[in-house]
Amino acid sequence: MAATLGFRDLGLIDYETAWHAMKRFTDERGREAADEVWLVQHPPVFTQGQSGKAEHLLLPGNIPVVQVDRGGQVTYHGPGQLVAYLMLDVRRLGFGVRDLVTRIENTLIALLADYGVKAAAKADAPGVYVDGAKIASLGLRIRNGCSFHGLALNVDMDLEPFRRINPCGYAGLAMTQLSDQAGQIEFSEVSARLRAQLVKHLDYAEQATLTGGINHYD
């Protein structure tokens, strides 16, 4: 079991700022560096993964599109969505990539169960679904044995921009969110529950709250 998983709550932050910072963090970390999770929300943005195809961007309109280095296709981030960037030494943890993906999916399924929402993963389409509608997405990159990028859980947000794309490359894929499934919820409580479930499902002994921003990685 790993020792401590540190969490930084960064609030609303520009996508590209977070992306460049997580790449630099991963490139500069040493073998003894502690693992971190950055909890954020983003202003509206579409991100196109390495497998992304232009035809899945239907009508982006005035929402920016950023080509990124994670796996997967196009998705949307916006306020009211809880994003967790997972900077983990996967090699040290002893996880394979498929194992890591399964653990993240199980984390989200357990979190949703805390709210009485029955969710499931799909073997052929990474993410978490409620009655066939996608409630959480994930996309990772592994570099030098360490992960970055992570997961995005729709908590209480405007889902309309998802209709401007084929989410994750699937035409007509329905999207849902926790507030539609469980009623009124506190975003901060969801974040706290996600922290606890990540610690449990990634086999850490405890969690720690990290202070300070990420400007030195930007």
From Swiss-Prot:
**BPL/LPL catalytic domain spans which residues?**
31-206
Pfam assignment, any one:
LplA-B_cat
State the GO CC annotations. Answer: cytoplasm
Please state what class of enzyme this protein is. transferase
Q: Which UniProt keywords apply?
A: Acyltransferase, Cytoplasm, Transferase
Q: Where is this site: Lowers pKa of active site Cys?
A: K134
What's its EC? 2.3.1.181
Q: Where is the active site?
A: C168
State the pathway, as annotated in the record.
Protein modification; protein lipoylation via endogenous pathway; protein N(6)-(lipoyl)lysine from octanoyl-[acyl-carrier-protein]: step 1/2
Q: What does this protein do?
A: Catalyzes the transfer of endogenously produced octanoic acid from octanoyl-acyl-carrier-protein onto the lipoyl domains of lipoate-dependent enzymes. Lipoyl-ACP can also act as a substrate although octanoyl-ACP is likely to be the physiological substrate.
Q: Which NCBIfam families match?
A: lipB (TIGR00214), PRK14342.1 (NF010922), PRK14345.1 (NF010925)
PANTHER family, per database record: LIPOYLTRANSFERASE 2, MITOCHONDRIAL-RELATED, OCTANOYLTRANSFERASE
Q: What is this protein called?
A: Octanoyltransferase
Q: Gene encoding this polypeptide?
A: lipB
